[in-house]
Amino acid sequence: MLPNCRKRSFGDAKSPATAPRHAAGAEWHGAQTTVSTSLQLAQARYLHLAAQGLLQAPTRAAKPTDIAACIQRMALLQIDTIHVVSRSPYLVLHSRLGDYPREWLEEALASGQIFETWAHEACFAPMDDLRLHRAYNRLTRRHWGLAKADKTHVAQRPHLDKLLEHIRNLGPVKSSDFERPEGKGGAWWGWKDEKRWLEALFGLGELMIARRENFHRVYDLSERVAPKLLQPAPEWAPAELDTALTEKAIAALGITQARWVHDYFRTKPRLKDSDLDTLVEQGRVMRVEVQGWDAPGYVHASHAAMLKKAIAGRLEATHTTLLSPFDPVVWDRERASVFFDFDYRLECYTPEEKRVYGYFVLPILCRGELIGRLDAKAHRAEGVFEVRALHVQPGTVWTAAQVTDVAQALQRSADWHGTPQVRITRTQPAKVAAALRRALKEAVAS
């Protein structure tokens, strides 16, 4: 197995990425390394949000096909099980699509439009990228889950083979299909042996997730979940895999600095500007200037038309919504700080007495800016969406229009959660609470 960190030479080999080398109307060509026009920070931010599907409010009702399309646009959708409000993958989709039935995500998985993999963390990804992720994971074993799978493979392979034979003969299984001896647990969060073996086989690529039932994984043989794996696979050199994921990350981010690219798919090492020279020279990536940045920005060639709109000031931010802590826009703390002047850290793993904002805090996106954050809990039995604490971004004062936008976004989220009564417990500053309550009454009345 090759080591995780390899010398990179992006673009030297043919890339498996499918994005066009030059978008229609692009003015940037292969040998040119820097765009002569710079962007203002707000223009760069709008380009970032547009690429992520968060710049403009939805203009129509969501359709089932929007689930896979949304994940295709982001290139991945991180999975997390915390559910004081809706679980993160559902919330990330709601931030972009508006109201939709949660079962659409399960249907997209079961129908083979998307699959589960280790990418940024545990993620859903487009089925078109299956071979790319499998090849990269086989090469790098970059995640803790993959490293655990390798250790289990070495230590307990006979058990894995017996479990595989069970699935081959009897069909898909859940970990709950196996009884757990009372009081006995394994090494991974107290998991029983069969759960660890299933996860190991998933990490090894021998099993895939066929579907989810009540968000619980259902495991089956990889070739039954994705029959195309039985077909001959393309051979990719390490540089080709690096290039493909680098291009996908740059495209998903809209505009990025080199040092932020690696975090999107958790590739190694962190990139330097010189690592992207070849892609820039080949015209697959454009190097731009952003006012106030101490480093160049990078835009994928597929976004050339959108970049021109951003520079011309023709991207308009109209969307207000709540974001998941695991939304790609905020999961990189440094990137969120540079784009939005917003210092965000997830505190659910911090001892309660040391938390500043709350357990599961949702950033508030309002027309292209992060203007605050709130700690919420959906009391489903009572039908109440509780805002336990809301903090306005330090140094800012909300306008009446922003209060209205946030109140409407809160009510939309509450309705989608099935908890239509919004309860404001505490805000900072305190006077925001009364203004929000008035705006919420107006939102309900309208």
Q: What label would you give each PLM region?
A:
Residues S15-T18, G25:
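Periodic, rod-like helical contexts
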Residues G11-A13, A23, G30:
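Short hydrophobic alpha-helical segments enriched in small aliphatic residues
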Residues R8, W28-T321, D327-V330, R335, ...:
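Long, low-complexity intrinsically disordered regions
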